[in-house]
Design a protein with these regions (language model features):
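Elongated extramembrane "stalk/tether" segments
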Residues: 25-72
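Cytosol-/stroma-facing membrane-proximal "stalk/adaptor" domains immediately downstream
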Residues: 90-153
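Short, charged/polar, low-complexity loop and linker segments
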Residues: 44-58, 76-89, 113-115
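Generic structural signal for well-ordered, non-membrane alpha-helices
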Residues: 44-45, 68, 72-79, 107-108, ...
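N-terminal signal-anchor transmembrane alpha helix of single-pass membrane proteins
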Residues: 1-34
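Short, solvent-exposed segments of well-ordered alpha helices
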Residues: 53-68, 89, 119-126, 130
Length: 153
């Protein structure tokens, strides 16, 4: 019984380590053309402005509104990725699914700690905005590829 519990704990710890490391590696990859600002402006998304505000001193009361705004941006980008008129519509890659799971965990953590540990909430919000930037770049590259195909036709 003790050995089973030990194996379960160690396996869970290794899975969490792998998950975090994989998410960090995915977020560190940057595409050559950065489409995130254009996608954010075109779709009225606020993650770019929120990221800029988070790099300055922020009042604790505004963290909750930032979290809600990022969740709204997440829903919009997820909808766009799932319904874009490309060959990849409705399908998410493994990387995108990992980032979606991480976003939901970060949103939950942010909601739980924003009053008691504002710096931890700020860190979670910054990572949430990085995930949204990744999704915006994916969306922008899909649109650019589609525009390139239309120009060749």
């Amino acid at each position: 019984m003790l050995m089973t519990l030990l194996i379960l704990v160690v396996s869970s710890a290794l899975f969490l380590y792998w998950f975090r490391y994989t998410v960090i590696l995915i977020l560190r990859t940057r595409p050559a053309p950065d489409y995130a600002p254009q996608v954010a402006v075109a779709n009225h998304l606020s993650f770019v402005e929120i990221r800029q505000k988070l790099h300055a001193p922020v009042e604790t009361e505004s963290l909750g509104s930032f979290c809600k705004a990022l969740q709204q941006d997440y829903r919009m980008l997820k909808y766009l990725l799932g319904h874009a008129a490309t060959g990849q519509a409705g399908r998410y890659t493994v990387e995108q699914r990992l980032l979606m799971a991480n976003f939901r965990v970060l949103a939950l953590c942010c909601a739980m700690v924003q009053r008691f540990q504002p710096n931890a909430a700020k860190t979670a919000l910054l990572e949430m905005s990085s995930i949204l930037e990744y999704f915006a770049n994916v969306m922008g590259s899909r649109v650019a590829a589609l525009a390139g195909e239309a120009a060749r036709a």
